[in-house]
């Protein structure tokens, strides 16, 4: 904001006093005009002198008081304003002291809440880690069961529990994901096969197979743990809304970028739901009675894709299925993006 605009605002706030001073001087001029014993020239000189001194006083006052408002306008910290003692009159000082006390109290509350949230997240993370130990032991016990329908059912339920625990674990790690990432060159085929193996019990229970067309020599520069999480959530989403039809997974290069395509033939996503599928907690506006979906999986995908530099594109037709296309960045592009994030 320019100084002229600041001065105009200053004059508007003092308009009552200015009008009052002008009014008093007009009365003096009127009295001099009516009373012949009073010299109009003398009164005119006095009025001119008073108005000139008043203008100088207003300019001087403006230069002193405007510093406080300019600091507030520029979003300066209240501590800086208080330290520089920019408040000139008692009213301004009371306002600054009030804001200082209020903001200090709010900051203390925010710190307390952040510590509470961190403590809760830490407790939840420890709980998930602790509960995964008996879940792993449960898997060993299930593996000792004889082959049959009972074992398949147990493996299916175990896989669902393990998936939910992993989802919750990654959800609690979102805030610290930047510190938790380690980028390295790895085989995309290996990442996909590992996740297919992890979800095989659910796919077998639903009669769904995997049609894999993965090029052997395609490597990506990424964080293995978080990238696997993205693939897992997309596979989980495809398995959840498919029944009895294979999921096609293929990899290829497109314009120098490694691309992973996951296509299912499930119920698909409606056109009006497509822009919202990455929102936390969003499930569907069509199938409102759906209780198996939490709306967390694709939210996790959306939360880490930018840090990994992966572009995610979704195509879907109701009744025909959904295709997720993951385009990986080149290593130099990812490094440049990470540098930009670091310098921001």
From Swiss-Prot:
One of its GO terms (molecular function) is phosphoprotein phosphatase activity. The chain crosses the membrane at residues 18-38, 43-63. Its EC number is 2.7.13.3. It is an enzyme of class 2 (transferase). Keywords: Antibiotic resistance, ATP-binding, Cell membrane, Kinase, Membrane, Nucleotide-binding, Phosphoprotein, Transferase, Transmembrane, Transmembrane helix, Two-component regulatory system, Virulence. SUPFAM superfamilies: ATPase domain of HSP90 chaperone/DNA topoisomerase II/histidine kinase, Homodimeric domain of signal transducing histidine kinase. GO terms for biological process: cellular response to phosphate starvation; response to antibiotic. The modification Phosphohistidine is found at residue 129. It is a multi-pass membrane protein. Residues 126-332 form the Histidine kinase domain. The keyword Transmembrane helix applies. It is found in: Cell membrane. Autophosphorylated. Member of the two-component regulatory system GraR/GraS involved in resistance against cationic antimicrobial peptides (CAMPs). GraS probably functions as a sensor protein kinase which is autophosphorylated at a histidine residue and transfers its phosphate group to GraR. PANTHER family: HISTIDINE KINASE (PTHR45453:SF2), PHOSPHATE REGULON SENSOR PROTEIN PHOR (PTHR45453). This is Sensor histidine kinase GraS. It comes from Staphylococcus haemolyticus (strain JCSC1435). The lineage of its organism: Bacteria, Bacillati, Bacillota, Bacilli, Bacillales.
